[in-house]
Amino acid sequence: MAKKGTLTGLLLFGIFFGAGNLIFPPSLGALSGEHFLPAIAGFVFSGVGIAVLTLIIGTLNPKGYIYEISTKIAPWFATLYLSVLYLSIGPFFATPRTATTAYEVGISPLLSDANKGLGLIVFTVLYFAAAYLISLNPSKILDRIGRILTPVFAILIVILVVLGAIKYGGTSPQAASAAYQASAFGTGFLEGYNTLDALASVAFSVIAVQTLKQLGFSSKKEYISTIWVVGIVVALAFSALYIGLGFLGNQFPVPAEAMKGGTPGVYILSQATQEIFGSTAQLFLAAMVTVTCFTTTVGLIVSTAEFFNERFPQISYKVYATAFTLIGFAIANLGLDAIIKYSIPVLVILYPITIAIVMIVIVNKFVALSKPGMQLTIAVVTVIAIASVLGSSFKVEFLANLVSVLPFAKASLPWLVPAIVGILLSLVLPNKQESDVFEME
């Protein structure tokens, strides 16, 4: 049980931990100043807690989120919601972004300006070709990512953090930003929430279930116990690297001009690497960032292809994997900025819906809930999420004004109280539904 859980946990941590997870903690460390400890506590509590809880809820029943959403809300909604989620977080956003991030941070600085355009094409051809070859055999990713690549990038990050702590430890942190001075834990909590990692948890729960089935279990008790081991491994690995990277950012001296943009994480990683490793710094950074991004790319291709193959089996897994790899490659080279412009609002809409679904599933594990009440809850959260994005991102003023009067709107959580009210109503409305108890196949 412990071995199966540890292996699966390392695999999931490897595909979870991407470029954004490298950059956010050093930024928080620099911006939180003397309030680092409560800030990183809030960040870990939400960023790790929400993601791991969403992952566990999605794997407790081997039928996954598609079954939970279909039975509690509606089959058509489950297919629509998950299709949009997988496409948004996969080939149309995160997959190409991981490739371009690996190139821009790790490879581009090694090239002359004249060769950077050609360099991107060559790099992404090799990058996506390697990811595609691994993704063609999903049953092998436990060995190739969980046993090999995850330890590689984790060790590289640990080396950077340890050497950074030795070199910069004891340095007085810079003054905290106004937000962290006002509420360090609260600001850290919101930064963790805004990583959107719960969306990846939904996507990667498919890989978790398939990997656990592949390992085999003698009983439902062993399966469930292993899932909790998986959650603990992922949580500990994330927390350790988040705290280490955050401490590096907190101790590293960042000039004022690098702080102005509000996200000094990339500057800290590149400059700290340069000062610690000297002439080999860029090679170290290239290896660390590329491997970190690559594992996420493989995970996204596999999970997206597996989902669509399960929902629409007329097309083979290989065709889906090929299509999503080619789409990611094309966008990485032709139009990433435009795609990100439209993908991020979609992800921001999906996020509160995802959290609301997880809340419903958790409560329904303990008490019966009304199906109309659950449907109403998700409908209200969806409307608020869409109105919030249209109001803030697309400047629809009357919608922005409507959303702003809701509780916690300033904290980017206008949907939270309506979701809680909807769940409470589900306790008293008719047509109550017990949580399904699964049996091992």
Feature names for model-found ranges:
Residues 137-148, 185, 208-237, 255-267, ...:
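Hydrophobic, small-residue-rich membrane helices and short re-entrant helix-turn-helix hairpins
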